[in-house]
Curated annotation (Swiss-Prot):
ATP binds at residue 264. Keywords: Aminoacyl-tRNA synthetase, ATP-binding, Cytoplasm, Ligase, Nucleotide-binding, Protein biosynthesis. It catalyses: tRNA(Glu) + L-glutamate + ATP = L-glutamyl-tRNA(Glu) + AMP + diphosphate. It is found in: Cytoplasm. Its main location: cytoplasm. It is an enzyme of class 6 (ligase). GO terms for molecular function: ATP binding; glutamate-tRNA ligase activity; tRNA binding; zinc ion binding. Transmembrane segments: none annotated. A motif ('HIGH' region) lies at residues 11-21. GO terms for biological process: glutamyl-tRNA aminoacylation. Pfam families: Anticodon_2 (PF19269), tRNA-synt_1c (PF00749). This is Glutamate--tRNA ligase. Catalyzes the attachment of glutamate to tRNA(Glu) in a two-step reaction: glutamate is first activated by ATP to form Glu-AMP and then transferred to the acceptor end of tRNA(Glu).
C-alpha cells in the first residue's frame, strides 16, 4: 500500500477484554505492523453509566500481555491528535463544534421527545408490524413554529437530544475489505438518530467519525456486528464533505458447539482474556488462536508466532464464513505452545506449585531443577494450561494418600503381594545411591518378575502401593529416581508401619 496506514483499536472501559475485542485489536495491530503503519489506542468512554473502575487499565494490561504494543494512545500522546479519551475530547469541545455546525446547517436538530413518548411510538409500531423508526415531531411545521415548540419544551424543563436528519431514500455503499460491496438504504436506518445525548455527550456513531477523521484513520477493521453502524457513519462523513476510511467487517464469532453468536452474557463459556490468563494459558497461544478466527493462512500449519503473523498478514485472506470459537481447539493450541516452549514456561509451572501450597518461594528458587523433573514426570505434556499441573503433581510427589483397605487386601495382604513387597524392599535398600536411577530400578522389577514368576498388576501394584500409596500413576521407576532413595525407603517404612 502506498498510503500511510493508520488504524485504531477503540475499546470502551465497560469491562474486561473479550475474545472478540481482542481479535479486533490483533488484526488492526497486524495490519499496521505488516504495512509499517501506525496502531492507535483510543478510549471510547462516553457511556459514563456503564464504565467500570479500572476498565481502561484492564483493557490495556491484557493487550500488553498478548504482546500488542501501540504507537499512540492515552499513555503515548501525539499532540497533533491528543487527547485519546473521548471524555477528555468532549470536555475540550471537540464534538460540540461539529454538532453546532450541523445544527446551523439544518442537517441536525434538537428533539425534546420524552422516553415515555418514544416508548409509546415503538409499541404502536410493533402492534402495526412495522420496523421501529423515529417519527419526526416537527412534520409540517414552519421554522417559526418549530422554534416556538422547542421554546415551550425548554421552558417546561424538558431535556433535548440532538438528532441527525437522515436523507430520504439514499443508498450508502462501500467496498468492504472482508464482505466485498455492501449497500444499505437510508430507509433501513430507523429514522433520524441521536448524535448528542441529553447529558451533552456525543453518541458512538457520531463521535467515532469525528475522532477517526481528526486522527487521520485510514482503515477501520471491526466485527460484523458493526455493519449496521456504517451507514450512519458514512452520512456524517458526507455531511462534512470528508473522505471516509476503508471499512472491513470481520466474520461473526460463533460457538462451535451451538453455532450461536459468542455472547458476553453466556457465563458457561470462558471468553475473556483475563480468565485464560488466570488458568495459565500462554499469551503466544492466545494470540495464535485468536489470529485464526476469521482469517486463513496459506497451507495447513496452525501454529504461528506473532512475527510470522506479521509477515504473512494479508487482508485478502479474511474469511466471510462465521468464525468458530472452539475451546477444545484453543486448549490444543495452548498445549502445543507449552510443549514447544517448555523451558520458558517452567518458572510459571513451578509457580503453580507455590500457589497450590505444595512448596514455598524459597523451595521454588532453590530446587528449580528438581521441581522441573517432577513436573515433567507428572505429565506436563498432557495438560492444556499451567494451572493443571499442581493437581497432577500433588500426589505422590508432595503428599501421600492413605492406602485404601480394598487396595491393601487386594495387593499387599496376599501371598504374592507380600513376596513382591519384601523382595523389592530388600533389593531397593541394597541399591547404591549413585545407581538409584530409573534404568536400574526398572531392572530390579524385571528381575523380580523373573525370580518370582509374577507379572502384570500382581507385580507392579504392590510395588506402587508401598512406594507411592497409589496403584496408578506416572512412570514408577522415574518417580522413584527423581524423588530419591531416602524418600522411597521412608514411604516403604511408612507403609509397613501402618
Amino acid at each position: 500500500m502506498t498510503e500511510k496506514i493508520r488504524v485504531r483499536y477503540a475499546p470502551s472501559p465497560t469491562g474486561h477484554l473479550h475474545i472478540g475485542n481482542a481479535r479486533t485489536a490483533i488484526f488492526n495491530w497486524l495490519f499496521a505492523r505488516h504495512y509499517n503503519g501506525q496502531f492507535i489506542i483510543r478510549i471510547e468512554d462516553t457511556d459514563l453509566a456503564r464504565n467500570v473502575k479500572d476498565g481502561e487499565k484492564s483493557q490495556l494490561d491484557n493487550l500488553q500481555w498478548l504482546g500488542i504494543d501501540w504507537d499512540e494512545g492515552p499513555d503515548k500522546a501525539n499532540s497533533k491528535y491528543a487527547p485519546y479519551r473521548q471524555t477528555e475530547r468532549a470536555a475540550q469541545g471537540v464534538y460540540q463544534k461539529y454538532i453546532d455546525e450541523l445544527l446551523a446547517s439544518g442537517k441536525a436538530y434538537k428533539s425534546y421527545k420524552t422516553e415515555a413518548t418514544l416508548k409509546e411510538e415503538r409499541e404502536a409500531q410493533a402492534q402495526a408490524h412495522q420496523a421501529p423508526h423515529y417519527v419526526y415531531e416537527y412534520a409540517g411545521m414552519t421554522k417559526e413554529q418549530i422554534k416556538d415548540a422547542q421554546a415551550k419544551d425548554e421552558a417546561a424543563g424538558l431535556k433535548s437530544v440532538v438528532r441527525f436528519r437522515v436523507p430520504e431514500n439514499h443508498d450508502y455503499q462501500w467496498q468492504d475489505l472482508v464482505k466485498g460491496e455492501v449497500k444499505i438504504n437510508s430507509k433501513e436506518i430507523g429514522g433520524d438518530w441521536v448524535i448528542q445525548k441529553a447529558d451533552g455527550m456525543p453518541t458512538y456513531n457520531f463521535a467515532v467519525v469525528i475522532d477517526d477523521h481528526l486522527m487521520e484513520i485510514t482503515h477501520v477493521l471491526r466485527g460484523d456486528d458493526h455493519v449496521s453502524n456504517t451507514p450512519k457513519q458514512l452520512m456524517v462523513y458526507e455531511a462534512f464533505g470528508w473522505k471516509a476510511p476503508a471499512f472491513g467487517h470481520m466474520a461473526l464469532i460463533i460457538k462451535a458447539e451451538t453455532g450461536k453468536k459468542l455472547s458476553k452474557r453466556d457465563e458457561d463459556t470462558l471468553q475473556f482474556i483475563e480468565q485464560y490468563r488466570e488458568l495459565g494459558y500462554l499469551p503466544e497461544a492466545m494470540f495464535n488462536f485468536i489470529g485464526l478466527l476469521g482469517w486463513s493462512p496459506v497451507g495447513e500449519n496452525e501454529i504461528f508466532t506473532r512475527e510470522q503473523f506479521k509477515e504473512m498478514f494479508d487482508e485478502n485472506r479474511f474469511t466471510k464464513a462465521n468464525a468458530k470459537f472452539d475451546a477444545k481447539k484453543l486448549a490444543w493450541v495452548n498445549n502445543q505452545w507449552m510443549r514447544s516452549e517448555k523451558e520458558k514456561v517452567m518458572p510459571q509451572l513451578i509457580h503453580e506449585l507455590v500457589k497450590a501450597g505444595l512448596i514455598n518461594d524459597q523451595q521454588a528458587k532453590n530446587d528449580a531443577d528438581h521441581l522441573a523433573k517432577i513436573i515433567e514426570i507428572a505429565g506436563v505434556d498432557g495438560i492444556k494450561a499451567t494451572s493443571e499441573i499442581a493437581p497432577l503433581a500433588e500426589y505422590p510427589f508432595f503428599k501421600l494418600h492413605d492406602i485404601s483397605k480394598e487396595d491393601r487386601q487386594s495387593w499387599l495382604e496376599t501371598d504374592d503381594g507380600q513376596k513382591v513387597a519384601a523382595a523389592f524392599t530388600e533389593k531397593i535398600k541394597a541399591l547404591a545411591e549413585d545407581e538409584f536411577k530409573a534404568g536400574h530400578i526398572l531392572q530390579i522389577i524385571r528381575d523380580l518378575q523373573h525370580d518370582l514368576q509374577i507379572k502384570g498388576r500382581p507385580l507392579w501394584n504392590p510395588i506402587r502401593l508401598i512406594t507411592t500409596h497409589e496403584v496408578q500413576g506416572p512412570n514408577l521407576p522415574e518417580i522413584l529416581a527423581v524423588m530419591g532413595k531416602d524418600w522411597t525407603i521412608k514411604n516403604i517404612q511408612l507403609t509397613v508401619a501402618v
